[in-house]
Amino acid sequence: MRHSNSGKKLGRTPSHRKALFRNMAKALLTYGKIRTTETKAKELRRIVEPLITLALRNDLHSRRLAYDVLGSHQLVKRLFDDIGPAFVGVSGGFTRVVKLGLPRKGDNAPLAVIELTHQPAAEAPAEEKKAAE
């Protein structure tokens, strides 16, 4: 019986799973969207959504809790200064999982894209300005 056993094991040890989701969370918060398997995307939501909720609280304790998960001061700064303000007034549903039509070549795994529903506004104009110069 699987009573009170939440989360998928994904055929990995607990330390491997922790490292996997830490790296995936870093990638999602850095790039805004990533392509992965459906199962990993759905499990990643359980890590990223509480991080964005911490960013909405925006106090020192929340920053320290986010650093525990992310392990990067630059990413914590980006989370609290850029990503968090984009979600002010939103009470949940910070990420979206979109299933892709074609499975992965090789092992036929179903693929999905996980993305942030609100992209930080400060990013895009700065990149376009750099490209124009």
From Swiss-Prot:
GO terms for cellular component: cytosolic large ribosomal subunit. Belongs to the bacterial ribosomal protein bL17 family. SUPFAM superfamilies: Prokaryotic ribosomal protein L17. The keyword Ribosomal protein applies. The gene is rplQ. The keyword Oxidoreductase does not apply. Part of the 50S ribosomal subunit. Contacts protein L32. NCBIfam families: L17. GO terms for biological process: translation. It holds the Pfam family Ribosomal_L17. InterPro entries: Ribosomal_bL17 (IPR000456), Ribosomal_bL17_sf (IPR036373). It comes from the Bacteria. This is Large ribosomal subunit protein bL17. Keywords: Ribonucleoprotein, Ribosomal protein. GO terms for molecular function: structural constituent of ribosome.
